[in-house]
C-alpha cells in the first residue's frame, strides 16, 4: 500500500472522496476505516481519523455518536489554552458576548452568503468581521501559530496571519481547506473596491486594534481560541469606532475544513447555524460558469464530485 504523512491534513481530506465512493459498495464504515492504519498514533492522528469517521457517518444514524467522539478527542488536546504569566487583574473581565449568542453561516455552492453577510454587518447589535478571512481560524494549526510566541506576541501574530483584515490590498495569503493558501483574497472578495464610487479600500488601524486587544487580554489569566475569537471582535469594533453594545457574533465561517468546523462546534456547541441555499440550476450555473467557458472539464467534474461527497 502507499504511504502518507500521518500529520498531513490534505492527505486525510483526500481520503474522504474515495471512501465515500467505496461506501456505496461497502456500507460498513468501520470496515472501510479498518484499512487505514497509520503507524503514528499521536493525538493529531487519532483526531484526523475520528474526523474522517464523522465525515463518513455524516447524515446517517450514527453521526451524533461520531460527532461526540471527535469533540471528546478535541477537548483533550494540548495547547487549548494559554496562561497569562503577567496577569495584573487591574480590570474585571469585560461583558463579552456569550457563547449562546453566536451565529455561523455556511454556504452551499454560490448561494449568496456574501450578500447576506453584507446585509447583516451594519446591524448595530451584531459584531462581525468582513469577508471569509477567518474561515479556518478554528483549525488547530491557526491557534498554534497565534500562541507560538507566547502571550505577549499573540496580538502581533494574529495581525500578521490576518494582515488582509487590516488592509484589503494585502498579498499575505490566508489559509483555506486542506492547508491551502489563498493570496489577494481581499481583492478577490471585493474588499479593495468599496464605497459609493467603488474606489475605497477596507482598512483598519492596527495600532488601535492591537492596543484594545491587549487591554482586553490583560483582564484574563488564561485564554482559549474561542474567548480570543470574541476579544478579536470587541477589539475590531473599537478600532472602527463602533461602541454600541453587541448582543450577537455573526461568523461567516463559509466553507471550513471539517476539522476546523468541528473544533468550532466543540468550542461553542450552542451556536446557531445558517446554511444558505439557492435555486439549484442558478447555483450550479454561477458555480461552474467560468470553468465551463474555459472548457475546463477537470475543474467542473472535481467541483461536482466535491459537492456530492
Q: Language-model features: where?
A:
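TPR alpha-solenoid repeat register
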Residues: 11, 43-47
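Glycine-rich phosphate-binding P-loop
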Residues: 105-120
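PAPS-dependent sulfotransferase catalytic domain
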Residues: 202-309
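Structural signature of tandem alpha-helical TPR/SEL1-like repeats
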Residues: 22-34, 61-65
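PAPS-dependent sulfation machinery
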Residues: 132-252
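Structural marker of alpha-solenoid helical repeat scaffolds
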Residues: 4, 36-39, 73
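Residue-level recognition of tetratricopeptide repeat
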Residues: 17, 51-56
Amino acid at each position: 500500500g502507499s504511504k502518507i504523512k500521518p500529520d498531513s491534513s490534505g492527505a486525510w481530506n483526500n481520503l474522504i472522496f474515495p471512501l465515500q465512493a467505496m461506501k456505496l459498495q461497502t456500507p460498513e464504515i468501520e470496515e472501510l476505516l479498518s484499512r487505514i492504519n497509520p503507524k503514528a498514533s499521536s493525538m493529531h492522528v487519532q483526531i484526523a481519523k475520528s474526523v474522517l469517521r464523522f465525515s463518513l457517518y455524516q447524515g446517517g444514524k450514527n453521526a451524533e455518536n461520531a460527532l461526540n467522539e471527535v469533540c471528546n478527542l478535541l477537548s483533550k488536546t494540548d495547547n487549548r489554552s494559554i496562561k497569562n504569566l503577567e496577569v495584573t487583574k487591574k480590570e474585571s473581565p469585560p461583558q463579552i458576548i456569550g457563547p449562546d449568542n453566536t451565529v455561523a453561516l455556511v454556504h452551499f455552492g454560490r448561494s449568496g452568503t456574501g450578500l447576506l453577510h453584507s446585509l447583516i454587518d451594519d446591524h448595530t447589535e451584531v459584531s462581525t468581521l468582513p469577508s471569509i478571512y477567518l474561515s479556518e481560524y478554528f483549525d488547530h494549526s491557526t491557534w498554534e501559530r497565534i500562541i507560538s510566541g507566547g502571550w505577549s506576541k499573540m496580538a502581533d501574530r494574529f495581525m500578521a496571519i490576518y494582515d488582509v483584515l487590516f488592509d484589503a490590498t494585502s498579498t499575505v495569503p490566508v489559509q483555506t481547506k486542506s492547508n491551502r493558501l489563498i493570496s489577494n483574497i481581499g481583492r478577490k472578495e471585493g474588499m479593495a473596491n468599496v464605497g459609493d464610487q467603488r474606489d475605497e479600500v477596507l482598512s483598519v488601524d492596527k495600532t488601535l486594534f492591537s492596543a484594545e486587544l491587549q487591554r482586553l487580554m490583560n483582564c484574563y489569566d488564561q485564554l482559549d481560541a474561542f474567548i480570543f475569537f470574541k476579544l478579536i471582535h470587541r477589539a475590531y469594533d473599537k478600532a472602527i469606532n463602533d461602541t454600541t453594545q453587541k448582543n450577537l457574533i455573526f461568523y461567516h465561517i463559509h466553507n471550513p475544513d471539517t476539522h476546523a468546523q468541528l473544533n468550532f462546534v466543540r468550542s461553542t456547541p450552542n451556536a446557531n447555524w445558517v446554511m444558505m441555499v439557492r435555486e439549484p440550476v442558478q447555483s450550479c450555473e454561477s458555480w461552474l460558469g467560468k470553468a465551463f467557458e474555459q472548457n475546463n472539464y477537470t475543474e467542473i467534474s472535481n467541483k461536482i464530485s466535491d459537492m456530492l461527497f
